Amino acid sequence: MATDARGVVAITGATGFLGRHLVRALAQDGWRPRVLVRRDPVHPFWRDLEVEVVTGDLGTPRALDRLAKGAEVFIHVAGLIKARTLEGFNRVNQDGARAAAEAARAAGARFILVSSLAAREPSLSNYAASKRAGEDAVRAADPSALIVRPPAIYGPGDTETLGLFQLAARSPVLPVLSQTSRVAMIHVEDAAAKLVAFCRTPVLGLVELSDVRRDGYTWTEIMRGAAHVMGAKPRLIRLPDPGILTAGALVDAWSSLTNTPSVFGLGKARELLHTDWTPSSAPMAEGVPSKFGLIDGFTHTVDWYRAAGWLPKNIVA
């Protein structure tokens, strides 16, 4: 752990998956995390840390001003991953990003927007369009801001990836999406470490992150990797693109009928079938190298799941 005292880092989205790890990584590097939360209680992941809490949300200007005041860096991690309409996404991913950037600039804090690699292809989905809109809003509010686009993030505490390992262990078959797609991945600890490095060393412009394999992975490699760390050998079955798109459209129809947003839908199906989700920025722009590749990252994650009781320790295929 670093011993040199650093400044205050303001963080939105601190109770989310990446945000929780980021707060810990910043504190361990000597920074003083200040987080925006809707409710006051400190998250269990931070119980042993000194974390300053500001109560409020992205729609509360006074809370954003308190969050940003005196901060050296402002990292905006908060975002919406499911909404029924583009307008619903934009209220958080565009308007919230703009409000955070404006508060940071007024306070004289360097601003870092954690966006998504999906923003590179805004025509694919409402989510992707809203993330690009958020980037554009931040550039307009603060041209000196750094925009960081992580790919798919996984690691300890991730509830989304848990289902992949459960399926890999128990199912005799695993679905494989487009055989031509390449998908970048990053372990959450690597993503947090890179953001901490950007706090130490100012970077401008746009950076796209990855793990040790900047050319990404095929869906076959990802599914085989998940099965491997679970000690399973399921058969891989290629899902046809039209079937995936149809499933997405049906989910959208049900979401509209029930007025219940879903992460998966036609837009997400298009994202999953897109051929290139690998970083285009120079590797040196990431600041620090990644530690984890796919297999050791998956192994580290599964070890955590088992220790936490999220996966049985004796689970077999």
Swiss-Prot record:
Pfam families (alphabetical): Epimerase
Primary localization: periplasm
Transmembrane segments annotated in the record for this chain: none
Organism superkingdom: Bacteria
Keywords for the protein's UniProt record, in alphabetical order: Lipid metabolism, Oxidoreductase, Periplasm, Signal
Gene3D superfamilies: NAD(P)-binding Rossmann-like Domain (3.40.50.720)
Gene Ontology annotations for the cellular component aspect, listed alphabetically: membrane; periplasmic space
One example of a Gene Ontology biological process annotation: sphingolipid metabolic process
EC number, UniProt record: 1.-.-.-
Protein's pathway: Lipid metabolism; sphingolipid metabolism
InterPro entries per the UniProt record, alphabetical: ComplexI_NDUFA9_subunit, Epimerase_deHydtase, NAD(P)-bd_dom_sf
Molecular function GO terms recorded: oxidoreductase activity; protein-containing complex binding
Signal sequence annotation: 1-27
Consequence of gene disruption: Deletion mutant cannot form dihydroceramide. Deletion of the gene results in a ceramide molecule with a mass reduction of 2 Da, corresponding to a loss of two hydrogens. Mutants are impaired in growth at elevated temperatures but are resistant towards the antibiotic polymyxin B.
Recorded catalytic activity of this chain's protein: N-acyl-3-oxosphinganine + NADH + H(+) = an N-acylsphinganine + NAD(+)
Subcellular location: Periplasm
Family recorded in the similarity comment: Belongs to the NAD(P)-dependent epimerase/dehydratase family.
Functional summary from the UniProt entry: Involved in de novo bacterial ceramide synthesis. Catalyzes the reduction of bacterial oxidized ceramides to bacterial dihydroceramides.
Misc. comment: The bacterial ceramide synthesis pathway operates in a different order from that in eukaryotes. Furthermore, phylogenetic analyses support the hypothesis that the bacterial and eukaryotic ceramide pathways evolved independently.
Record PANTHER family: NADH DEHYDROGENASE [UBIQUINONE] 1 ALPHA SUBCOMPLEX SUBUNIT 9, MITOCHONDRIAL, NADH-UBIQUINONE OXIDOREDUCTASE 39 KDA SUBUNIT-RELATED
Name listed for the protein in its UniProt record: Ceramide reductase
Originating organism: Caulobacter vibrioides (strain NA1000 / CB15N) (Caulobacter crescentus)
